[in-house]
Structure formats: C-alpha cells, structure tokens
C-alpha cells in the first residue's frame, strides 16, 4: 500500500465560557461593524468524542466535521484554559473504517499520530462515546484572533444513533439540548 503525505495542523487556543449577555454584545458588535476585516460566519459542526478503557491519557480524541464535508481526527490536550490541538484530515471512508473497527490503515500510515491512534483503538479500546452537534459562530477580529462560540448544542449518546455521517438536519432532530 502506497503511503501519502498527510497535511497535519497543530495549534494552541485559549478557552473561556461567556455569558449570554457577552455573546449578544459580541454578535451585535460584529453585525454593526463597518470594518471589512471584522466579520462573522456560522458553520454547522459535528463532533464525535472517543473514550478509552483507561482515563489516564492526557489526550482527548475526536472526529470533527464542518459543513457535513470536511472530516478531521483531532487530538486535544488541555492545561487549564490553554488547549493544544492537532488535527489530521480524514476521508469519510477512513472515518467509517474507524467506526467499523478496521484500524489497519492507521498502522500503515507514515504519520506517527495515526500510528499511535492504532494502539489507542486496539490496546486502550478507544470507542465512540457521544456526538455533539452545534452551530459554530466565528467572530473574526483580525488575522491573529478569532472568537469562537458554539450555540444550539445537542449531545446524543453514540449508542442511540450510530450514523455519525448523517446530514446535519437529520442529526438535530434527536438528542438532548445543553
């Protein structure tokens, strides 16, 4: 099997919770802004969180999909409000292979993170825990700073609906709101 180069992105973010009043104020500020550098976009987002047999791992793993199209395998490590993330693009076919328990392509990859994930799935018994769907609002301030807020969050245990790749509208019909 021929291995291809994988485009991997690693970054750090600072997180905090905001109140409804802070969110409303930020949204109004962007709606009224005349600056072309300041804008706001909304994306439908789906996340599938994985859990292992041992909770001692400093990392969290999950699928992340925007617009029902772009799928990423994410590795996250949190230290207080600072979050380090690494994201690797996957095809939906590769994502479905993981959900079906076919992990061989992870081991065959040239990407060390995918190789280590093979062992997380096989040895640490990493498995899907729950799906989270939301609308992600991105408030772009400048080329160095975005404020990101998730709204209309719906969480569903994976066992209740195993079709992670269903379209966004279908997925929002079930689950519990947060």
Language-model segments: residues:
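Phosphate-end processing signature that detects enzymes handling 5′-triphosphorylated RNA
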Residues: 1-178
